Amino acid sequence: MTEQKNKTSLIEFPCTFPLKVMGAVHPEFEQAVLDTVRLHAPDTQAHHITTRPSSKGNYTGATVQVKVENQEQLDNIYRALTSHKLVKVVL
């Protein structure tokens, strides 16, 4: 498969991107998400994340406002989050 060199992105970089993360109800979920994002976006602070329980209380939802410089950085954050054991879905 040939990789496209000139991909057209709908996102203009750099930007602040809202990552939506759903995961397990766990006391360390919020910190785990924050720590994982910080691996690729070290300037991300605790006040950049908000969490809320799902309607039935089975999951926790988090929104992280992340400053990203390019598509590669955003892709790396997605890969890191989706591979975390407490994370179910990343949008």
From Swiss-Prot:
Gene3D superfamilies: 3.30.70.260. Pfam families: DUF493 (PF04359). PANTHER family: UPF0250 PROTEIN YBED. Belongs to the UPF0250 family. This is UPF0250 protein NMC1112. It comes from Neisseria meningitidis serogroup C / serotype 2a (strain ATCC 700532 / DSM 15464 / FAM18).
